[in-house]
């Protein structure tokens, strides 16, 4: 966990989890609200996987309780290596709120399905989510390329890809 907020009125903001090796048997969360009926938001959480093995899912930001009313916004995941047995979520909301602005960037590794944003509630917004396969070149306003981006590594494997999804 970058942060695990267990109080109803607590918020998770700009927390990061990094995995570079070893084995994680459960889930990895950048920032997560696990309180029953949480009312605040999980904002800007991030998870970075560069090696090792994750036996569960990877979440940039998440709210785990179905009775929660907060939103998951601006969360991100970068997978550059390693293996994720489960699913990768930029943002995941099991409550009644939204999962918006999630970004997943994949430059390597092996994983199951990938979601930019996911909500468990029909009608809850999953807008503005992005999945990047590789990273972009840096371009100046004049149009000059100043740094090469990172392509997806050879041998990378990904299951299904979803920009946003409502349960």
Predicted features and spans:
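Surface-exposed loop/turn motifs in large extracellular/passenger domains
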Residues: 1-27, 32-57, 62-87, 92-113, ...
């Amino acid at each position: 966990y970058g942060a695990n907020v267990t109080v109803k009125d607590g918020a998770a903001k700009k927390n990061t989890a990094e995995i570079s090796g070893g084995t994680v048997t459960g889930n990895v969360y950048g920032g997560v609200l696990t309180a029953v009926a949480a009312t605040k938001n999980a904002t800007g959480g991030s998870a970075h996987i560069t090696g090792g093995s994750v036996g569960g899912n990877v979440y940039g930001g998440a709210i785990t309780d179905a009775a929660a009313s907060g939103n998951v916004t601006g969360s991100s995941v970068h997978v550059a290596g390693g293996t994720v047995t489960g699913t990768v979520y930029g943002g995941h909301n099991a409550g009644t709120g939204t999962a918006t602005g999630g970004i997943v960037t994949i430059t390597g590794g092996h994983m199951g399905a990938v979601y930019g944003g996911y909500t468990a509630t029909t009608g809850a917004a999953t807008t503005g989510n992005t999945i990047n396969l590789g990273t972009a070149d840096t371009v100046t306003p004049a149009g000059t390329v100043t740094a090469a981006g990172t392509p997806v590594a050879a041998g990378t494997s990904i299951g299904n890809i979803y920009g946003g999804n409502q349960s």
